[in-house]
Amino acid sequence: MKSKYTARPEGKQSGQGLVFDSVTKRFGGKVAVRDVSLKLEAGERVAVIGPSGAGKTTLLRLAAGALQPDVGTVRFDGSSSTGSTATLAYQGETLVDRRTALSNVLTGRLGALSWLRGFIEPLLPQHPEPALERLDAVGLVGRADVPVKSLSAGERQRVAFARALMQDAEVVLADEPTANLDPSSRRNVIDVLDAALDGELLVTVLHEVDLALEHFDRIVGMADGRVRFDTPARAVTDDQLDALFAAGASTPGTDAERTGTEKESDIPVPWYV
């Protein structure tokens, strides 16, 4: 059944794109992203695919401003109509365990720093309907009053995603939003992502190539930190996919996301970006 969720106020004008200009990012001397140039337009649905360690998550964190490039620039391109330009929902995002799912999602409206999380309950909006709609969209409205610490890993991920959607950002970045979900829920989550947006740019890292090809307009294939192809979904070929994943398998020594002295996963990411 289609959710009643409508994520953006009527009349909101979105015109924000994202530009990577010759971007390189290193960790401990290892290159995670190398010489990437992309221009992503407002309203596009972009899936980033590739083998593990290809630089996909690093690319999203550069887009969110959680990481800075060593070479090149990342910038927003277009007119911004809100104070919140980009929101990042990534796998394993930290939630406040002792608070309920609803309380966590409500904090998505705030631009507070993470260290204030334990002190913000008095500031939470008194009308929970928008947060309940987002929980409904991810299939958790029946768990709204359950403390996050009692939720499964997949449920926690969906709560984090619902919270990110509360920010009314113009660029939405989702790192493996279908991870830890059962097969029947994966397509629902992708449908939720699409329905949530109205003119915003969506950039999603996915491991499920079939979902990427079915639900996204544009596919960016990454391996060894490089963009191997950037193609409309309808034009992606089996040969391109075979070469993409073969490239990742043949270059394990360049996997900076896993082998750098400063691992990407060790770098804290602000929950509010």
From Swiss-Prot:
Enzyme class, UniProt record, top EC level: translocase
Catalytic activity reported: phosphonate(out) + ATP + H2O = phosphonate(in) + ADP + phosphate + H(+)
Location in or out of the cell: Cell membrane
KW Transferase (keyword) present: no
Major place of residence: membrane
Keyword Ribosomal protein: no
Residues at which ATP binds: 50-57
GO CC annotation terms, alphabetical: plasma membrane
PROSITE patterns cross-referenced by the UniProt entry: ABC_TRANSPORTER_1, ABC_TRANSPORTER_2
GO molecular function, one term: ABC-type phosphonate transporter activity
Gene3D superfamilies from the UniProt entry: P-loop containing nucleotide triphosphate hydrolases
Known role: Part of the ABC transporter complex PhnCDE involved in phosphonates import. Responsible for energy coupling to the transport system.
Complex and partners: The complex is composed of two ATP-binding proteins (PhnC), two transmembrane proteins (PhnE) and a solute-binding protein (PhnD).
Name of the protein described by the UniProt record: Phosphonates import ATP-binding protein PhnC 1
